[in-house]
Every structure is written in structure tokens, then in C-alpha cells.
UniProtKB/Swiss-Prot annotation:
HAMAP family: Ribosomal_uL23_B (MF_01369_B). GO terms for biological process: translation. InterPro entries: Nucleotide-bd_a/b_plait_sf (IPR012677), Ribosomal_uL23-like (IPR013025), Ribosomal_uL23/eL15/eS24_sf (IPR012678). Part of the 50S ribosomal subunit. Contacts protein L29, and trigger factor when it is bound to the ribosome. It holds the Pfam family Ribosomal_L23. GO terms for cellular component: ribonucleoprotein complex; ribosome. This is Large ribosomal subunit protein uL23. The keyword Nucleus does not apply. SUPFAM superfamilies: Ribosomal proteins S24e, L23 and L15e. It comes from Syntrophobacter fumaroxidans (strain DSM 10017 / MPOB). One of the early assembly proteins it binds 23S rRNA. One of the proteins that surrounds the polypeptide exit tunnel on the outside of the ribosome. Forms the main docking site for trigger factor binding to the ribosome. One of its GO terms (molecular function) is structural constituent of ribosome.
Length: 97
């Protein structure tokens, strides 16, 4: 396995919506490196989880502005990926969530 694959996928996004999408449409959600492209994300998911990826959709999320005392600060920007896997395949990491 390539070490670069682990740098591309930062963490899984587990929300109520992502759990529903996983169960109904075989879609997995990840927070990924902001510089990663769809091809790199697809290869990383296939290498790490041993599944066949059909589609990858990415979205850039701008960080929110938050107030700290009398000053404003900004949270970090991030990138999310929605990965569709082949029907019938499962990722054990996400089972039971």
C-alpha cells in the first residue's frame, strides 16, 4: 500500500446524511487533502479499502468566520469527497455506524 494514499484521505465524515447515503446508494464521505484530485482520491480508496470505485464527487468548503472575544478568526478551508462504490460491495470500517 502506498503511504501517499493515507495522506490523501484525512478522515471519514460520519453524519446522519452520510450514513443514509451509505446504506441506500453505496456512497462514502471523506475529508481529503485540499490538493488531491478525483483520480488520486479514487486510487487511494481502492488501495486502502479494496473496493471498486464508480464515481468521485468533490466539494471545497470554505472555513467559517468565528468570533473569539472581540476578534474574528477563520476556521480552515477543507475539501470533502463523496465516493460511490460498486453495488454489493461493503467497507467493514463503515459497518455498524
Amino acid at each position: 500500500m502506498n503511504e501517499k494514499s493515507y495522506r490523501i484521505l484525512k478522515r471519514p465524515l460520519v453524519t446522519e446524511k452520510s450514513t443514509t447515503e451509505k446504506d441506500e446508494h453505496n456512497k462514502l464521505f471523506f475529508e481529503v487533502d485540499r490538493r488531491a484530485n478525483k483520480i488520486e482520491i479514487k486510487e487511494a480508496v481502492e488501495q486502502i479499502f479494496k473496493v471498486d470505485v464508480l464515481d468521485v464527487a468533490t466539494m471545497n468548503v470554505r472555513g467559517k468566520k468565528k468570533r473569539v472575544g472581540r476578534y474574528f478568526t477563520k476556521r480552515a478551508d477543507r475539501k470533502k469527497a463523496m465516493v460511490t462504490i460498486k453495488p454489493g460491495q461493503r467497507v467493514e470500517f463503515f459497518e455498524g455506524v
